[in-house]
Amino acid sequence: GAFKISTEGAGAWASSATMNTATYGGRGIGTTTALVGAGGDGSDDKNTETYNGTAWTTETALNTGHYIAGSFGASSTSAMMASGYDAPINVVDVEEWNGSAWTEKANVNTARRGGGGAGIVTAGLIFGGYSTGIVAICESWNGSAWTETADLNTAQEDIFQGIGTQTASQCVGPPTENETFNGTSWSEQAE
């Protein structure tokens, strides 16, 4: 056999403005404009900041702490934070961001933290995480209610975050887990 060599264009990292509040365990949505919410464990776990491509702005805080929540959305004006941790417990609470405020939505079925999320505010998923142990549970959001769907093949927590849509998602978690969802089932991918 022969090897085929290909090259890809290289990208470059650049510095940008610093967030107003130091955070860890927060979840983000977006690309050049972004939203970060729920960073920090304890008093900071309700923080929300948006990024306009140049600077960060402190926004209305979440109603409930969602540290290491499952998050998904399309932009800095349309996002969801689902479940997560608000010391000392995992929470079932879900909130939707409309660009200026958080609104409580229907609760998830299983409280967990460290799970992933994918999709938009009217069609999303949260998957994996830690409940009373590491879980493979996947729940689907239709804009008004949560339904448990096909579980991940491998229970995972501290998921790096999900990407994609409700019917075409990818879950990447430590140390080398990689699964895709086609709207019906999860499939293991090369790690």
Model-derived segments and their meaning:
Residues 1-191:
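Polar, enzyme-active/binding microenvironments
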